[in-house]
């Protein structure tokens, strides 16, 4: 077999690891995303594990409808933060990103039947703003997560299109709720009259919008943090193939447009041919990947590019994730 140049010889300009993320204590929000099938969940869980070694408390949230973090950790998670087995400071939860405002729990609207009616009316009102229904569900999750005071929160996101929508939620909510709350004084007399007709003397706009008013400051804070590189960063995960590289470039352009920091790329599932064994398929695969690694080097010379190997086994369970995650901070050598 012809000798080939190791991929690890590339990318000398910046540390080829996520040490910069681990060592940046100010980071509050870390998003991990990319094209489907590139190993985002394994990378998300590995980042979470590495951060748990140095942070006070870490939460990983799956916003992917497939909810693969349960499979990765080999432990069932729900919409409530649950301690990951084997850790004292790492929690995981799974949320359904497709739930809308109407799916929020009843205790979101504290009070008697009047508030249930308020929920229905506000739901109809919010329906006039495209994207706000789904965004409000995300807003409630962010409000709860914010109140739990985790040191760092990692989002294991769905494929690229949904991820970009997720990141736009704070600005969607800020604009839409601002408009709704600005109308409150105008519609308040009509709501009071409507309540009187139904024999509900206490029904008023203040009660109906109280939760929205609680949510808006949190969302403004989160929106500001998302655009602050001291608090938020995005880790792009890809494989060394044309479609994945194309999707990564599109993602980075959108993140830049949205003013969201990104300076880490993880290239997953790389083949490192053995000099001891003949493997024509491995060498052919390596040469294809190396072509795209060269392109990544040219395109993203100001990024930390971490290379992860294609393994012969699944990365499932805490022990295997811990072992695999070491490649994120210590560059892999075949």
Swiss-Prot record:
Enzyme nomenclature, EC number: 3.6.-.-
Single GO molecular function: ATP binding
Classification via SUPFAM superfamilies: P-loop containing nucleoside triphosphate hydrolases (SSF52540)
Residue numbers binding Zn(2+): 279, 282
Major localisation: cytoplasm
CDD domains with a match to the protein in the record: ArsA (cd02035)
Compartment list: Cytoplasm; Endoplasmic reticulum
Residues engaged in binding ATP: 35-42, 241, 268
Key word Acetylation present: no
Domain of life: Eukaryota
Gene Ontology CC terms: GET complex
Stretches of the chain forming a coiled coil according to its record: none
Keywords: ATP-binding, Cytoplasm, Endoplasmic reticulum, Hydrolase, Metal-binding, Nucleotide-binding, Transport, Zinc
Cysteines engaged in disulfide bonds, as pairs: none
Entry-linked InterPro entries: Anion-transp_ATPase-like_dom, ATPase_ArsA/GET3, ATPase_ArsA/GET3_euk, P-loop_NTPase
Active-site residues (renumbered): 64
A Gene Ontology BP annotation from the UniProt entry: tail-anchored membrane protein insertion into ER membrane
Pfam families registered for this protein in UniProt: ArsA_ATPase
Function: ATPase required for the post-translational delivery of tail-anchored (TA) proteins to the endoplasmic reticulum. Recognizes and selectively binds the transmembrane domain of TA proteins in the cytosol. This complex then targets to the endoplasmic reticulum by membrane-bound receptors, where the tail-anchored protein is released for insertion. This process is regulated by ATP binding and hydrolysis. ATP binding drives the homodimer towards the closed dimer state, facilitating recognition of newly synthesized TA membrane proteins. ATP hydrolysis is required for insertion.
PANTHER family: ARSENICAL PUMP-DRIVING ATPASE ARSENITE-TRANSLOCATING ATPASE, ATPASE GET3
Family as reported in the entry's similarity comment: Belongs to the arsA ATPase family.
Protein name: ATPase ASNA1 homolog
Source organism per UniProt: Nematostella vectensis (Starlet sea anemone)
């Amino acid at each position: 077999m012809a000798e080939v140049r190791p991929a690890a010889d590339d990318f000398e300009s910046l540390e080829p690891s996520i040490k910069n993320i681990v060592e940046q204590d100010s980071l509050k929000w870390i998003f991990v995303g990319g094209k489907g099938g590139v190993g985002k969940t394994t990378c998300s869980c590995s980042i979470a594990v590495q951060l748990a070694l140095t942070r006070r408390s870490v939460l990983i949230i799956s916003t992917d409808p497939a909810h693969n973090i349960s499979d990765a950790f080999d432990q069932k998670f729900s919409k409530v933060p649950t301690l990951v087995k084997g850790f004292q400071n790492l929690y995981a939860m799974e949320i359904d990103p497709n739930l809308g405002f109407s799916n929020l729990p009843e205790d979101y609207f504290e009070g008697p039947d009047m508030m249930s009616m308020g929920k229905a009316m506000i739901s109809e009102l919010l329906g006039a703003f495209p994207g706000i229904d789904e965004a409000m569900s995300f807003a409630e999750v962010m409000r709860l997560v914010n109140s739990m005071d985790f040191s760092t929160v990692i989002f294991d996101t769905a494929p690229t299109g949904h991820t970009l929508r997720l990141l736009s939620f704070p600005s969607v909510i800020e604009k839409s709720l601002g408009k709704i709350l600005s109308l409150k004084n105008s519609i308040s007399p009509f709501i009071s009259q409507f309540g009187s007709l139904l024999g509900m003397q206490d029904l008023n706009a203040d009660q109906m919008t109280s939760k929205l008013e609680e949510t808006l400051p949190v969302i403004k804070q989160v929106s500001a943090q998302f655009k602050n590189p001291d608090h938020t960063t995005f880790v792009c995960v890809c494989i060394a193939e044309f479609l994945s590289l194309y999707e990564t470039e599109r993602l980075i352009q959108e993140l830049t447009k949205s003013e969201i920091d990104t300076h880490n790329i993880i290239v997953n599932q790389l083949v490192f041919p053995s000099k001891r064994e003949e493997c024509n398929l491995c060498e052919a695969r390596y040469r294809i990947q190396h072509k795209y690694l060269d392109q990544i080097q040219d395109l993203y010379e100001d990024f930390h590019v971490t290379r992860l190997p294609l393994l012969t086994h699944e990365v499932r369970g805490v022990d295997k994730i811990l072992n695999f995650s070491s490649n994120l901070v210590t560059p892999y050598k075949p």
